[in-house]
Amino acid sequence: MCGISGYWGSDRRIAAQLAASLDTIGHRGPDDRGTHVANDVSMGMTRLSIIDLEGGSQPVYNEDRTIAVVFNGEIYNYRDLMRHLIAKGHQFTTRSDTEVLVHLYEEHGARMVTHLRGMFAFAIHDARSGCLFLARDRFGKKPLFYRAHGEGLSFASEIKGLKPYARAAGERWNVSQQAVADYLSLSSVPQPATIYEGVFCLPAGTYATFRDSHLDIQAYWSPTFSPKTSLTYTEAQRETRRLIGESVKLRLRSDVPLGVFLSGGVDSSVIAYEAAQVLGSTLQCFTVSTGGELDESDLAAQTAKLLGVQHHVLPLRLDPVEGLYKVVEHYDQPFADSSAIPSLQIAKLAAEHVTVVLNGDGGDEVFAGYRRYIAAANVSRLSWIPQPMAGKLAAKFGSHSRSRRSPLGFAARFARGLSMAPEERYLAWTSDMFREPDKAAHWVGPPVQATERLVADTLVAGISQLDQQLESDRRINLLSGLLVKMDMACMAESLEARSPLLDHTLAEFAWRLPDGYRVRRGTPKMVLRDAYRAVLPSGVTSGEKRGFEIPLNDWLSGDLKPLLHDLLGSPNARVRSFVDDSLITGLLSGTAFADRNRSYLLYALLVLELWLERESDDAAHE
Protein backbone atom coordinates (compact mmCIF):
# COMPACT_ATOMS: atom_id res chain seq x y z
CA MET A 1 0.00 0.00 0.00
CA CYS A 2 1.33 3.41 -0.92
CA GLY A 3 0.61 6.98 -1.71
CA ILE A 4 1.41 8.04 -5.27
CA SER A 5 1.86 11.43 -6.90
CA GLY A 6 3.12 12.89 -10.13
CA TYR A 7 3.09 15.57 -12.79
CA TRP A 8 3.29 15.41 -16.58
CA GLY A 9 4.18 18.66 -18.26
CA SER A 10 6.95 21.04 -19.24
CA ASP A 11 6.64 23.51 -16.34
CA ARG A 12 9.70 22.78 -14.20
CA ARG A 13 8.35 24.87 -11.31
CA ILE A 14 5.40 22.50 -11.00
CA ALA A 15 7.49 19.36 -11.53
CA ALA A 16 9.82 20.45 -8.74
CA GLN A 17 6.96 20.05 -6.24
CA LEU A 18 7.00 16.23 -6.35
CA ALA A 19 8.87 15.94 -3.05
CA ALA A 20 6.52 18.41 -1.35
CA SER A 21 3.53 16.48 -2.66
CA LEU A 22 4.91 13.19 -1.34
CA ASP A 23 5.47 14.84 2.04
CA THR A 24 1.75 15.63 2.32
CA ILE A 25 0.77 11.98 1.79
CA GLY A 26 3.65 10.38 3.67
CA HIS A 27 1.25 8.78 6.19
CA ARG A 28 0.04 6.46 3.43
CA GLY A 29 3.49 4.88 3.20
CA PRO A 30 6.08 5.62 5.89
CA ASP A 31 8.48 2.77 5.05
CA ASP A 32 10.08 3.91 1.79
CA ARG A 33 10.04 6.55 -0.93
CA GLY A 34 11.02 6.50 -4.58
CA THR A 35 10.79 8.77 -7.63
CA HIS A 36 10.96 8.53 -11.40
CA VAL A 37 11.94 11.63 -13.40
CA ALA A 38 12.29 11.53 -17.18
CA ASN A 39 11.67 14.19 -19.81
CA ASP A 40 8.29 15.73 -19.01
CA VAL A 41 7.20 13.30 -16.30
CA SER A 42 7.95 13.31 -12.58
CA MET A 43 6.25 10.75 -10.38
CA GLY A 44 6.86 9.02 -7.08
CA MET A 45 5.45 7.06 -4.19
CA THR A 46 5.59 6.63 -0.42
CA ARG A 47 5.48 2.94 0.48
CA LEU A 48 3.80 0.92 3.19
CA SER A 49 5.66 -2.40 2.87
CA ILE A 50 3.34 -5.42 2.72
CA ILE A 51 4.69 -7.84 0.07
CA ASP A 52 8.40 -8.49 -0.67
CA LEU A 53 9.62 -6.18 2.10
CA GLU A 54 13.19 -5.96 0.79
CA GLY A 55 12.66 -6.10 -2.97
CA GLY A 56 9.37 -4.30 -3.43
CA SER A 57 10.64 -0.72 -3.67
CA GLN A 58 9.20 1.56 -6.33
CA PRO A 59 9.22 2.81 -9.02
CA VAL A 60 9.46 -0.52 -10.83
CA TYR A 61 10.64 -0.78 -14.45
CA ASN A 62 10.44 -3.26 -17.29
CA GLU A 63 13.58 -4.91 -18.71
CA ASP A 64 14.73 -1.93 -20.82
CA ARG A 65 13.38 0.73 -18.42
CA THR A 66 11.03 2.20 -21.01
CA ILE A 67 8.04 1.56 -18.76
CA ALA A 68 7.86 2.72 -15.14
CA VAL A 69 5.08 2.33 -12.58
CA VAL A 70 4.12 3.79 -9.20
CA PHE A 71 1.37 1.83 -7.54
CA ASN A 72 -1.02 2.04 -4.59
CA GLY A 73 -2.89 -1.10 -3.61
CA GLU A 74 -2.64 -4.87 -3.85
CA ILE A 75 -2.97 -7.27 -6.77
CA TYR A 76 -4.22 -10.48 -5.19
CA ASN A 77 -3.81 -12.72 -8.23
CA TYR A 78 -0.26 -11.51 -8.90
CA ARG A 79 1.30 -14.95 -8.52
CA ASP A 80 -0.85 -16.43 -11.28
CA LEU A 81 -0.14 -13.40 -13.47
CA MET A 82 3.58 -13.65 -12.78
CA ARG A 83 3.66 -17.29 -13.88
CA HIS A 84 1.76 -16.38 -17.04
CA LEU A 85 4.15 -13.53 -17.85
CA ILE A 86 7.30 -15.58 -17.17
CA ALA A 87 5.96 -18.18 -19.59
CA LYS A 88 5.68 -15.36 -22.14
CA GLY A 89 9.38 -14.55 -21.67
CA HIS A 90 9.23 -11.61 -19.26
CA GLN A 91 12.06 -11.34 -16.75
CA PHE A 92 11.29 -10.44 -13.13
CA THR A 93 13.78 -8.97 -10.67
CA THR A 94 11.43 -8.94 -7.63
CA ARG A 95 8.63 -11.08 -6.25
CA SER A 96 6.31 -8.12 -5.68
CA ASP A 97 2.88 -7.56 -7.19
CA THR A 98 4.03 -4.15 -8.46
CA GLU A 99 6.38 -5.60 -11.07
CA VAL A 100 3.52 -7.61 -12.56
CA LEU A 101 1.98 -4.33 -13.71
CA VAL A 102 4.79 -3.22 -16.03
CA HIS A 103 5.06 -6.59 -17.76
CA LEU A 104 1.30 -6.98 -18.00
CA TYR A 105 1.15 -3.53 -19.60
CA GLU A 106 3.81 -4.60 -22.11
CA GLU A 107 1.78 -7.66 -22.95
CA HIS A 108 -1.76 -6.25 -23.07
CA GLY A 109 -1.56 -2.45 -23.10
CA ALA A 110 -4.53 -0.64 -21.58
CA ARG A 111 -6.59 -3.84 -21.39
CA MET A 112 -4.19 -5.12 -18.75
CA VAL A 113 -6.61 -3.86 -16.10
CA THR A 114 -9.17 -6.52 -17.02
CA HIS A 115 -6.73 -9.19 -15.79
CA LEU A 116 -6.30 -7.66 -12.33
CA ARG A 117 -8.04 -8.89 -9.21
CA GLY A 118 -7.45 -6.46 -6.41
CA MET A 119 -7.62 -2.87 -5.21
CA PHE A 120 -5.44 -0.41 -7.02
CA ALA A 121 -4.64 3.03 -8.32
CA PHE A 122 -1.47 3.33 -10.35
CA ALA A 123 0.38 5.43 -12.91
CA ILE A 124 2.54 4.07 -15.72
CA HIS A 125 4.95 6.17 -17.75
CA ASP A 126 5.29 4.66 -21.21
CA ALA A 127 8.38 6.28 -22.76
CA ARG A 128 7.94 4.34 -25.99
CA SER A 129 4.59 5.89 -26.88
CA GLY A 130 5.05 9.09 -24.87
CA CYS A 131 2.02 8.74 -22.63
CA LEU A 132 0.94 8.57 -19.01
CA PHE A 133 -1.44 5.73 -18.16
CA LEU A 134 -3.62 5.91 -15.04
CA ALA A 135 -5.99 3.24 -13.71
CA ARG A 136 -8.31 2.62 -10.78
CA ASP A 137 -9.91 -0.57 -9.47
CA ARG A 138 -13.47 -1.61 -10.24
CA PHE A 139 -15.11 -0.57 -6.97
CA GLY A 140 -12.90 2.47 -6.35
CA LYS A 141 -11.33 1.19 -3.13
CA LYS A 142 -8.14 3.12 -3.86
CA PRO A 143 -8.47 6.82 -4.73
CA LEU A 144 -6.72 8.78 -7.48
CA PHE A 145 -7.25 12.52 -7.93
CA TYR A 146 -6.09 14.70 -10.80
CA ARG A 147 -6.09 18.26 -12.12
CA ALA A 148 -5.12 19.80 -15.42
CA HIS A 149 -2.56 22.63 -15.39
CA GLY A 150 -2.65 24.25 -18.81
CA GLU A 151 -1.13 21.55 -21.02
CA GLY A 152 0.04 19.49 -18.03
CA LEU A 153 -1.60 17.13 -15.56
CA SER A 154 -0.96 16.37 -11.88
CA PHE A 155 -2.26 13.36 -9.94
CA ALA A 156 -2.12 12.11 -6.35
CA SER A 157 -3.68 9.61 -3.96
CA GLU A 158 -5.19 12.43 -1.90
CA ILE A 159 -6.34 15.93 -2.78
CA LYS A 160 -3.79 17.44 -0.41
CA GLY A 161 -1.11 15.88 -2.61
CA LEU A 162 -2.21 18.09 -5.53
CA LYS A 163 -1.93 21.36 -3.64
CA PRO A 164 1.86 21.83 -3.92
CA TYR A 165 1.54 21.60 -7.71
CA ALA A 166 -1.31 24.11 -7.67
CA ARG A 167 0.67 26.59 -5.57
CA ALA A 168 3.62 26.36 -7.96
CA ALA A 169 1.25 27.02 -10.85
CA GLY A 170 -0.14 30.08 -9.06
CA GLU A 171 -3.63 28.58 -8.85
CA ARG A 172 -6.37 29.41 -6.38
CA TRP A 173 -9.00 26.71 -6.19
CA ASN A 174 -12.67 27.64 -5.97
CA VAL A 175 -15.14 25.67 -3.87
CA SER A 176 -17.75 24.05 -6.11
CA GLN A 177 -21.27 25.25 -5.30
CA GLN A 178 -22.69 22.11 -6.90
CA ALA A 179 -20.48 19.90 -4.75
CA VAL A 180 -21.65 21.67 -1.58
CA ALA A 181 -25.30 21.22 -2.55
CA ASP A 182 -24.78 17.53 -3.31
CA TYR A 183 -22.84 17.06 -0.07
CA LEU A 184 -25.72 18.51 1.94
CA SER A 185 -27.99 15.91 0.34
CA LEU A 186 -25.67 12.89 0.53
CA SER A 187 -23.25 13.52 3.46
CA SER A 188 -20.24 13.30 1.13
CA VAL A 189 -19.14 14.76 -2.19
CA PRO A 190 -20.15 12.34 -4.96
CA GLN A 191 -17.36 11.16 -7.25
CA PRO A 192 -15.96 11.86 -9.77
CA ALA A 193 -16.48 15.47 -8.62
CA THR A 194 -14.65 16.90 -5.64
CA ILE A 195 -15.32 19.89 -3.42
CA TYR A 196 -13.10 21.95 -5.74
CA GLU A 197 -13.87 23.11 -9.25
CA GLY A 198 -11.45 21.56 -11.73
CA VAL A 199 -10.22 18.81 -9.39
CA PHE A 200 -11.56 15.34 -10.10
CA CYS A 201 -11.35 11.75 -8.95
CA LEU A 202 -10.63 9.19 -11.65
CA PRO A 203 -13.89 7.22 -11.85
CA ALA A 204 -13.92 3.72 -10.42
CA GLY A 205 -13.51 0.99 -13.01
CA THR A 206 -11.78 3.25 -15.55
CA TYR A 207 -8.36 3.87 -17.00
CA ALA A 208 -7.04 7.07 -18.55
CA THR A 209 -4.37 7.91 -21.09
CA PHE A 210 -2.74 11.35 -21.07
CA ARG A 211 -0.99 12.18 -24.32
CA ASP A 212 -0.45 15.46 -26.20
CA SER A 213 -2.17 17.43 -23.40
CA HIS A 214 -5.35 15.37 -23.75
CA LEU A 215 -6.82 13.05 -21.11
CA ASP A 216 -8.90 10.19 -22.48
CA ILE A 217 -10.90 8.23 -19.88
CA GLN A 218 -12.36 4.82 -20.72
CA ALA A 219 -14.51 2.48 -18.61
CA TYR A 220 -13.33 -1.12 -18.52
CA TRP A 221 -15.90 -2.61 -16.11
CA SER A 222 -19.52 -2.35 -15.11
CA PRO A 223 -21.56 -4.87 -13.13
CA THR A 224 -23.90 -7.37 -14.75
CA PHE A 225 -27.18 -8.37 -13.11
CA SER A 226 -28.31 -10.88 -15.73
CA PRO A 227 -28.78 -13.55 -16.78
CA LYS A 228 -29.84 -14.80 -13.38
CA THR A 229 -28.23 -18.02 -12.22
CA SER A 230 -29.99 -21.35 -12.66
CA LEU A 231 -28.47 -22.68 -9.43
CA THR A 232 -30.83 -23.97 -6.78
CA TYR A 233 -30.88 -22.12 -3.47
CA THR A 234 -28.78 -24.85 -1.84
CA GLU A 235 -26.28 -24.77 -4.71
CA ALA A 236 -26.11 -20.97 -4.44
CA GLN A 237 -25.20 -21.28 -0.76
CA ARG A 238 -22.35 -23.66 -1.58
CA GLU A 239 -21.03 -21.42 -4.34
CA THR A 240 -21.25 -18.40 -2.03
CA ARG A 241 -19.09 -20.24 0.52
CA ARG A 242 -16.60 -21.30 -2.14
CA LEU A 243 -16.15 -17.83 -3.63
CA ILE A 244 -15.86 -16.09 -0.25
CA GLY A 245 -13.32 -18.66 0.89
CA GLU A 246 -11.29 -18.08 -2.27
CA SER A 247 -11.49 -14.29 -1.89
CA VAL A 248 -10.37 -14.38 1.74
CA LYS A 249 -7.52 -16.79 1.01
CA LEU A 250 -6.18 -14.47 -1.70
CA ARG A 251 -6.27 -11.54 0.73
CA LEU A 252 -4.32 -13.36 3.42
CA ARG A 253 -1.10 -13.00 1.42
CA SER A 254 1.13 -10.69 3.42
CA ASP A 255 4.68 -10.48 4.72
CA VAL A 256 3.58 -8.41 7.73
CA PRO A 257 1.19 -9.06 10.67
CA LEU A 258 -2.45 -9.37 9.61
CA GLY A 259 -5.80 -9.45 11.41
CA VAL A 260 -9.57 -9.18 10.99
CA PHE A 261 -11.99 -6.50 12.17
CA LEU A 262 -14.69 -8.59 13.90
CA SER A 263 -18.04 -7.12 14.92
CA GLY A 264 -21.11 -9.10 15.92
CA GLY A 265 -22.48 -8.91 12.39
CA VAL A 266 -22.60 -11.65 9.80
CA ASP A 267 -20.25 -10.01 7.26
CA SER A 268 -17.14 -9.70 9.42
CA SER A 269 -17.92 -13.02 11.14
CA VAL A 270 -17.92 -14.75 7.75
CA ILE A 271 -14.51 -13.22 6.98
CA ALA A 272 -13.15 -14.30 10.37
CA TYR A 273 -14.45 -17.84 9.82
CA GLU A 274 -12.80 -18.19 6.40
CA ALA A 275 -9.54 -16.64 7.61
CA ALA A 276 -9.49 -19.04 10.56
CA GLN A 277 -9.76 -21.99 8.16
CA VAL A 278 -6.37 -20.91 6.78
CA LEU A 279 -4.55 -19.38 9.75
CA GLY A 280 -6.11 -21.30 12.62
CA SER A 281 -5.36 -20.10 16.14
CA THR A 282 -2.74 -17.61 14.93
CA LEU A 283 -5.45 -15.34 13.50
CA GLN A 284 -5.87 -12.06 15.39
CA CYS A 285 -9.36 -10.53 15.52
CA PHE A 286 -10.14 -7.01 16.71
CA THR A 287 -13.46 -5.92 18.17
CA VAL A 288 -14.41 -2.47 19.35
CA SER A 289 -16.36 -2.20 22.59
CA THR A 290 -18.59 0.87 22.53
CA GLY A 291 -20.77 0.16 25.57
CA GLY A 292 -24.53 0.61 25.48
CA GLU A 293 -27.25 -1.35 23.74
CA LEU A 294 -25.51 -1.48 20.36
CA ASP A 295 -22.28 -2.97 21.72
CA GLU A 296 -21.59 -6.18 19.80
CA SER A 297 -18.42 -7.26 21.60
CA ASP A 298 -20.18 -10.12 23.45
CA LEU A 299 -21.45 -11.59 20.19
CA ALA A 300 -18.03 -11.14 18.59
CA ALA A 301 -16.47 -12.93 21.55
CA GLN A 302 -18.78 -15.89 20.94
CA THR A 303 -17.60 -16.08 17.34
CA ALA A 304 -13.94 -15.78 18.30
CA LYS A 305 -14.28 -18.52 20.93
CA LEU A 306 -16.05 -20.81 18.47
CA LEU A 307 -13.30 -20.25 15.90
CA GLY A 308 -10.49 -20.60 18.44
CA VAL A 309 -8.72 -17.39 17.37
CA GLN A 310 -6.95 -14.64 19.27
CA HIS A 311 -9.42 -11.91 20.22
CA HIS A 312 -8.54 -8.33 21.12
CA VAL A 313 -11.36 -6.19 22.51
CA LEU A 314 -10.49 -2.53 22.05
CA PRO A 315 -12.38 -0.12 24.33
CA LEU A 316 -13.50 2.92 22.38
CA ARG A 317 -13.34 6.19 24.29
CA LEU A 318 -14.42 8.98 22.00
CA ASP A 319 -13.93 12.71 22.34
CA PRO A 320 -16.38 14.01 19.71
CA VAL A 321 -14.76 17.45 19.47
CA GLU A 322 -11.24 16.13 19.03
CA GLY A 323 -12.49 13.45 16.65
CA LEU A 324 -14.39 15.94 14.54
CA TYR A 325 -11.30 18.10 14.06
CA LYS A 326 -9.30 15.01 13.06
CA VAL A 327 -11.86 14.10 10.41
CA VAL A 328 -11.70 17.60 8.95
CA GLU A 329 -7.90 17.43 8.98
CA HIS A 330 -7.53 14.03 7.32
CA TYR A 331 -10.43 13.77 4.89
CA ASP A 332 -9.58 16.71 2.60
CA GLN A 333 -13.28 17.26 1.79
CA PRO A 334 -16.41 17.73 3.91
CA PHE A 335 -17.46 14.25 5.08
CA ALA A 336 -20.54 14.04 7.31
CA ASP A 337 -20.72 10.34 8.15
CA SER A 338 -20.25 10.66 11.91
CA SER A 339 -18.86 7.10 12.12
CA ALA A 340 -15.68 8.50 10.52
CA ILE A 341 -14.76 9.68 14.03
CA PRO A 342 -14.61 6.22 15.63
CA SER A 343 -13.22 4.77 12.40
CA LEU A 344 -10.08 6.87 12.82
CA GLN A 345 -9.66 5.69 16.41
CA ILE A 346 -10.32 2.05 15.54
CA ALA A 347 -7.65 2.22 12.84
CA LYS A 348 -5.21 3.72 15.33
CA LEU A 349 -5.87 0.96 17.87
CA ALA A 350 -5.55 -1.84 15.31
CA ALA A 351 -2.35 -0.36 13.85
CA GLU A 352 -0.68 -0.92 17.22
CA HIS A 353 -0.96 -4.68 16.58
CA VAL A 354 -1.01 -5.32 12.81
CA THR A 355 -0.29 -3.67 9.45
CA VAL A 356 -3.12 -5.30 7.47
CA VAL A 357 -6.76 -5.88 8.43
CA LEU A 358 -9.54 -7.70 6.62
CA ASN A 359 -13.06 -6.37 7.09
CA GLY A 360 -16.64 -7.16 6.12
CA ASP A 361 -17.21 -3.98 4.12
CA GLY A 362 -19.41 -4.37 1.07
CA GLY A 363 -21.48 -7.29 2.32
CA ASP A 364 -24.63 -5.18 2.39
CA GLU A 365 -24.11 -3.77 -1.10
CA VAL A 366 -23.23 -7.15 -2.60
CA PHE A 367 -25.71 -9.45 -0.83
CA ALA A 368 -28.49 -6.89 -0.16
CA GLY A 369 -28.19 -6.38 3.58
CA TYR A 370 -29.95 -3.09 4.29
CA ARG A 371 -33.61 -3.01 5.31
CA ARG A 372 -34.44 -0.77 2.39
CA TYR A 373 -33.67 -3.70 0.13
CA ILE A 374 -36.73 -5.42 1.59
CA ALA A 375 -38.70 -2.38 0.48
CA ALA A 376 -37.07 -2.40 -2.96
CA ALA A 377 -37.94 -6.07 -3.44
CA ASN A 378 -41.61 -5.29 -2.73
CA VAL A 379 -42.10 -1.82 -4.20
CA SER A 380 -43.48 -3.01 -7.55
CA ARG A 381 -46.31 -4.81 -5.75
CA LEU A 382 -47.28 -1.72 -3.76
CA SER A 383 -46.60 1.11 -6.19
CA TRP A 384 -50.33 1.29 -7.00
CA ILE A 385 -50.93 3.11 -3.70
CA PRO A 386 -51.81 6.75 -4.56
CA GLN A 387 -49.45 9.49 -3.42
CA PRO A 388 -51.97 11.06 -0.99
CA MET A 389 -52.53 7.73 0.75
CA ALA A 390 -48.79 6.99 0.85
CA GLY A 391 -48.22 10.45 2.32
CA LYS A 392 -50.80 9.85 5.04
CA LEU A 393 -49.21 6.50 5.91
CA ALA A 394 -45.78 8.11 6.09
CA ALA A 395 -47.09 10.90 8.33
CA LYS A 396 -48.82 8.41 10.62
CA PHE A 397 -45.75 6.22 11.01
CA GLY A 398 -43.39 9.18 11.22
CA SER A 399 -45.41 10.86 13.96
CA HIS A 400 -44.48 7.98 16.26
CA SER A 401 -40.78 7.79 15.42
CA ARG A 402 -38.18 9.79 13.51
CA SER A 403 -35.49 7.20 14.20
CA ARG A 404 -34.13 5.75 10.98
CA ARG A 405 -33.58 2.40 12.72
CA SER A 406 -36.96 1.94 14.41
CA PRO A 407 -39.61 -0.20 12.66
CA LEU A 408 -41.99 2.76 12.48
CA GLY A 409 -39.26 5.03 11.15
CA PHE A 410 -38.47 2.47 8.46
CA ALA A 411 -42.19 2.11 7.61
CA ALA A 412 -42.53 5.88 7.27
CA ARG A 413 -39.60 6.09 4.87
CA PHE A 414 -40.91 3.14 2.88
CA ALA A 415 -44.39 4.63 2.55
CA ARG A 416 -42.99 8.04 1.63
CA GLY A 417 -41.09 6.59 -1.31
CA LEU A 418 -43.74 4.23 -2.66
CA SER A 419 -45.22 6.43 -5.36
CA MET A 420 -42.08 8.44 -6.09
CA ALA A 421 -39.94 8.27 -9.20
CA PRO A 422 -36.93 5.94 -8.69
CA GLU A 423 -34.41 8.76 -8.25
CA GLU A 424 -36.60 10.54 -5.66
CA ARG A 425 -37.34 7.27 -3.89
CA TYR A 426 -33.66 6.45 -3.53
CA LEU A 427 -32.93 9.70 -1.70
CA ALA A 428 -36.08 9.42 0.42
CA TRP A 429 -35.02 5.95 1.55
CA THR A 430 -31.34 6.68 2.14
CA SER A 431 -31.09 10.22 3.48
CA ASP A 432 -32.58 12.59 6.05
CA MET A 433 -30.57 15.39 4.52
CA PHE A 434 -31.18 18.33 2.17
CA ARG A 435 -33.92 17.57 -0.38
CA GLU A 436 -35.03 19.49 -3.44
CA PRO A 437 -37.87 21.37 -1.66
CA ASP A 438 -35.33 22.37 0.99
CA LYS A 439 -33.02 23.75 -1.68
CA ALA A 440 -35.86 25.72 -3.22
CA ALA A 441 -36.66 27.24 0.16
CA HIS A 442 -33.22 27.74 1.69
CA TRP A 443 -30.38 27.60 -0.87
CA VAL A 444 -28.84 31.05 -1.32
CA GLY A 445 -25.88 30.21 -3.55
CA PRO A 446 -25.92 30.26 -7.35
CA PRO A 447 -28.42 27.90 -9.02
CA VAL A 448 -27.41 24.23 -8.83
CA GLN A 449 -28.66 21.03 -10.38
CA ALA A 450 -30.89 18.62 -8.51
CA THR A 451 -29.08 15.83 -6.67
CA GLU A 452 -31.59 13.40 -8.20
CA ARG A 453 -29.59 13.67 -11.43
CA LEU A 454 -26.86 11.56 -9.81
CA VAL A 455 -29.33 8.78 -9.05
CA ALA A 456 -30.84 9.05 -12.52
CA ASP A 457 -27.37 8.43 -13.97
CA THR A 458 -27.25 5.09 -12.13
CA LEU A 459 -30.57 3.79 -13.45
CA VAL A 460 -30.26 0.65 -15.58
CA ALA A 461 -33.05 -0.50 -17.87
CA GLY A 462 -34.47 -3.98 -17.54
CA ILE A 463 -33.36 -4.87 -14.00
CA SER A 464 -35.38 -5.37 -10.83
CA GLN A 465 -36.01 -2.68 -8.24
CA LEU A 466 -33.70 -4.57 -5.87
CA ASP A 467 -30.86 -4.67 -8.37
CA GLN A 468 -31.45 -1.00 -9.16
CA GLN A 469 -31.16 -0.08 -5.50
CA LEU A 470 -27.91 -2.05 -5.26
CA GLU A 471 -26.46 -0.34 -8.32
CA SER A 472 -27.37 3.14 -7.06
CA ASP A 473 -25.80 2.30 -3.70
CA ARG A 474 -22.63 1.01 -5.37
CA ARG A 475 -22.16 4.17 -7.39
CA ILE A 476 -23.16 6.68 -4.72
CA ASN A 477 -23.06 5.60 -1.07
CA LEU A 478 -20.44 2.85 -1.34
CA LEU A 479 -18.07 4.68 -3.68
CA SER A 480 -18.18 8.14 -2.11
CA GLY A 481 -19.11 7.14 1.43
CA LEU A 482 -18.04 3.82 2.91
CA LEU A 483 -14.91 3.30 0.80
CA VAL A 484 -13.72 6.88 1.35
CA LYS A 485 -14.26 6.53 5.09
CA MET A 486 -12.29 3.30 5.31
CA ASP A 487 -9.40 4.38 3.06
CA MET A 488 -8.85 7.74 4.71
CA ALA A 489 -9.19 6.41 8.28
CA CYS A 490 -6.85 3.46 7.78
CA MET A 491 -4.28 5.29 5.68
CA ALA A 492 -4.12 8.07 8.27
CA GLU A 493 -2.66 5.39 10.57
CA SER A 494 -0.60 3.56 7.89
CA LEU A 495 -2.96 0.59 8.10
CA GLU A 496 -4.03 -1.41 5.04
CA ALA A 497 -7.68 -2.52 4.91
CA ARG A 498 -8.80 -5.34 2.62
CA SER A 499 -12.44 -6.10 1.79
CA PRO A 500 -12.94 -9.70 0.58
CA LEU A 501 -16.68 -9.21 0.04
CA LEU A 502 -15.87 -6.55 -2.57
CA ASP A 503 -14.06 -9.02 -4.80
CA HIS A 504 -15.51 -8.39 -8.26
CA THR A 505 -15.80 -12.10 -9.09
CA LEU A 506 -17.80 -12.71 -5.92
CA ALA A 507 -19.94 -9.60 -6.44
CA GLU A 508 -20.81 -10.50 -10.01
CA PHE A 509 -21.98 -13.91 -8.82
CA ALA A 510 -24.09 -12.40 -6.02
CA TRP A 511 -25.71 -9.83 -8.31
CA ARG A 512 -26.86 -12.58 -10.65
CA LEU A 513 -28.70 -14.39 -7.88
CA PRO A 514 -32.50 -14.16 -8.04
CA ASP A 515 -34.02 -11.48 -5.81
CA GLY A 516 -35.63 -14.18 -3.69
CA TYR A 517 -32.25 -15.67 -2.79
CA ARG A 518 -31.00 -12.39 -1.35
CA VAL A 519 -34.19 -11.06 0.25
CA ARG A 520 -36.11 -14.11 1.46
CA ARG A 521 -39.10 -14.28 3.80
CA GLY A 522 -38.67 -10.60 4.61
CA THR A 523 -35.04 -11.06 5.67
CA PRO A 524 -32.19 -9.32 3.82
CA LYS A 525 -28.91 -11.01 2.91
CA MET A 526 -30.51 -14.41 3.35
CA VAL A 527 -28.30 -16.52 1.10
CA LEU A 528 -25.21 -15.35 2.98
CA ARG A 529 -26.83 -16.03 6.36
CA ASP A 530 -27.94 -19.50 5.33
CA ALA A 531 -24.57 -20.34 3.77
CA TYR A 532 -22.87 -19.91 7.17
CA ARG A 533 -25.71 -20.79 9.54
CA ALA A 534 -24.17 -24.13 10.49
CA VAL A 535 -20.73 -22.73 11.40
CA LEU A 536 -21.44 -19.41 13.16
CA PRO A 537 -23.41 -18.52 16.31
CA SER A 538 -27.15 -18.22 15.73
CA GLY A 539 -27.10 -14.67 17.07
CA VAL A 540 -24.80 -13.74 14.19
CA THR A 541 -26.69 -15.39 11.34
CA SER A 542 -30.18 -14.57 12.63
CA GLY A 543 -29.62 -11.21 14.27
CA GLU A 544 -30.75 -7.89 12.83
CA LYS A 545 -28.19 -5.60 11.26
CA ARG A 546 -27.13 -2.99 13.81
CA GLY A 547 -24.41 -1.09 12.05
CA PHE A 548 -21.95 1.23 13.72
CA GLU A 549 -24.46 3.58 15.31
CA ILE A 550 -23.16 6.88 16.67
CA PRO A 551 -25.15 8.74 19.37
CA LEU A 552 -25.29 11.84 17.19
CA ASN A 553 -28.25 13.44 18.97
CA ASP A 554 -26.44 13.08 22.29
CA TRP A 555 -23.25 14.53 20.84
CA LEU A 556 -25.02 17.57 19.38
CA SER A 557 -26.87 18.25 22.61
CA GLY A 558 -23.78 17.52 24.71
CA ASP A 559 -20.09 17.66 23.83
CA LEU A 560 -20.59 19.32 20.44
CA LYS A 561 -23.28 21.80 21.51
CA PRO A 562 -20.97 24.74 22.37
CA LEU A 563 -19.04 24.33 19.13
CA LEU A 564 -22.26 23.94 17.16
CA HIS A 565 -23.83 27.14 18.48
CA ASP A 566 -20.60 29.16 18.44
CA LEU A 567 -19.88 28.34 14.80
CA LEU A 568 -23.28 27.96 13.15
CA GLY A 569 -24.96 30.53 15.38
CA SER A 570 -22.49 33.22 14.39
CA PRO A 571 -23.77 35.75 11.84
CA ASN A 572 -20.37 35.34 10.16
CA ALA A 573 -20.71 31.59 9.71
CA ARG A 574 -19.33 30.66 6.30
CA VAL A 575 -22.14 28.18 5.63
CA ARG A 576 -24.50 31.15 5.41
CA SER A 577 -23.06 31.69 1.94
CA PHE A 578 -24.88 28.51 0.93
CA VAL A 579 -28.05 28.26 3.05
CA ASP A 580 -30.20 31.02 4.51
CA ASP A 581 -30.37 32.22 8.10
CA SER A 582 -33.86 30.83 8.68
CA LEU A 583 -32.72 27.25 8.08
CA ILE A 584 -29.77 27.53 10.46
CA THR A 585 -31.86 29.27 13.13
CA GLY A 586 -34.62 26.69 12.74
CA LEU A 587 -32.21 23.76 12.99
CA LEU A 588 -30.52 25.17 16.07
CA SER A 589 -33.85 25.88 17.78
CA GLY A 590 -35.40 22.57 16.75
CA THR A 591 -38.24 24.02 14.67
CA ALA A 592 -36.88 23.11 11.22
CA PHE A 593 -36.97 19.60 9.74
CA ALA A 594 -39.67 18.55 12.20
CA ASP A 595 -40.61 15.61 9.95
CA ARG A 596 -37.19 13.96 10.19
CA ASN A 597 -34.04 13.70 12.25
CA ARG A 598 -32.44 17.14 12.00
CA SER A 599 -29.18 15.91 13.57
CA TYR A 600 -27.79 14.68 10.26
CA LEU A 601 -28.09 18.04 8.50
CA LEU A 602 -26.90 19.93 11.58
CA TYR A 603 -23.82 17.75 11.76
CA ALA A 604 -23.21 18.13 8.01
CA LEU A 605 -23.36 21.93 8.33
CA LEU A 606 -20.98 21.83 11.31
CA VAL A 607 -18.48 19.71 9.37
CA LEU A 608 -18.79 22.04 6.39
CA GLU A 609 -18.23 25.11 8.58
CA LEU A 610 -15.09 23.61 10.11
CA TRP A 611 -13.83 22.57 6.69
CA LEU A 612 -14.44 26.06 5.26
CA GLU A 613 -12.63 27.56 8.26
CA ARG A 614 -9.64 25.30 7.68
CA GLU A 615 -9.70 26.09 3.97
CA SER A 616 -9.68 29.81 4.73
CA ASP A 617 -6.74 29.39 7.12
CA ASP A 618 -4.79 27.39 4.52
CA ALA A 619 -5.41 30.07 1.89
CA ALA A 620 -4.24 32.79 4.27
CA HIS A 621 -0.89 31.02 4.73
CA GLU A 622 -0.18 30.51 1.03
What is each PLM-predicted segment?
Residues M1-Y331, S343, A347, R533-A534, ...:
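Cysteine-centered catalytic environments shared across enzyme families
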Residues M1-I4, A20, R167-R172, E197-A204, ...:
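Adenosyl-5′-phosphate
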Residues Q333-D337:
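Acceptor-substrate binding/catalytic loop of class I
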Residues R138, Q345-R404, L482-L506:
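Active-site adenylate/phosphate-handling loop in enzymes that bind or generate adenylated species
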Residues V328-E329, R371-N378, A620-E622:
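Short secondary-structure boundary/capping segments
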Residues S185, L252, K305, E329-D332, ...:
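Hydrophobic alpha-helix feature that most strongly marks membrane-spanning transmembrane helices
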Residues I159, V379, R529-D530:
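Acceptor-binding helix/loop patch of EC 2.4 sugar-transfer enzymes
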Residues H84, Y165, V366-G369, F509:
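Residues that scaffold the ATP/ADP-binding catalytic core of kinase and kinase-like folds
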